[in-house]
Each structure stands twice: as structure tokens, then as C-alpha cells.
Regions:
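A short Gly-Trp-Pro
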Residues: 1-124
């Protein structure tokens, strides 16, 4: 599931008013090259970065141990994915206008990763 996140933590880490993540099954994820550097942004939530350049890679949460959320901008072939929902809309800055018809959630509920390791896709 591809999600726009409006939370305060994502805003500060991205330098933008919204971040975009894609959920994967944790068991199917692996780094191709190198090891990430971790930062605990809040209790139970770790964000990772490339040590060499500082690129934000993904976040993981103790609340959703079987899921990992990858920063969409780090992936190749971005046209493959399209956003499914907005999360943490309750934290959205007042002047940011959401201009689509995607589902909006006041918080984050997890369940963005499929058991087969592929990004979750809503049933047709």
C-alpha cells in the first residue's frame, strides 16, 4: 500500500509537508548494498538512512513488526505504484490542501504490507 504520511515526524525528517511510503512484508526485504544507519525517531519507531549520503530509506515500528515502510522516492520505476491513502491527516498542516479522492485516516493503522512480500494492493 502506498501512503502519503502527514505526521509531524515525517515532515521534519523529509523537509516537506508530506512523505510517501510503500508497505512491504518485513521478511521479504533486504538491502542490496551496505547497511543502513538507524535513528529512533520516537519510542518503538526506527528510521533508517544511508550512512554515506543520508538518504532516508525506510521506517519500522514495534507496533507492526512484520511490516516495513520504504520511502517511495528511493525506488526505481515510480510509475509502477500509485498512492492508496493518506495517513495522519490529523497532523496535516492547515494550508496543505489534499486534492485527491483517496481515503484519509486520522492516524496510521499499519496493514500496508502483503504476506507475499509485494506491496499491498486493494482488491479490485
Amino acid at each position: 500500500m502506498v501512503e502519503y504520511c502527514h505526521c509531524d515526524s515525517c515532515r521534519r525528517l523529509s523537509g516537506s509537508v508530506v512523505s510517501t511510503f510503500i508497505g512491504y512484508a518485513r521478511e521479504s526485504f533486504g538491502m542490496i548494498d551496505g547497511e543502513p544507519v538507524y535513528y529512533q525517531s520516537s519510542p518503538g519507531t526506527r528510521r533508517s538512512f544511508r550512512g554515506a549520503c543520508g538518504t532516508r530509506l525506510f521506517f519500522e515500528s514495534d507496533d507492526y513488526p512484520e511490516e516495513i515502510y520504504i520511502s517511495v522516492g528511493t525506488l526505481e520505476d515510480l510509475e509502477t505504484w500509485s498512492p492508496d491513502r493518506h495517513v495522519w491527516v490529523s497532523d496535516k498542516v492547515s494550508w496543505h490542501v489534499i486534492g485527491d479522492d483517496l481515503a484519509q485516516h486520522d492516524a496510521f493503522s499499519g496493514s500496508g504490507a502483503a504476506a507475499d512480500g509485494l506491496p499491498y494492493k486493494k482488491p479490485a
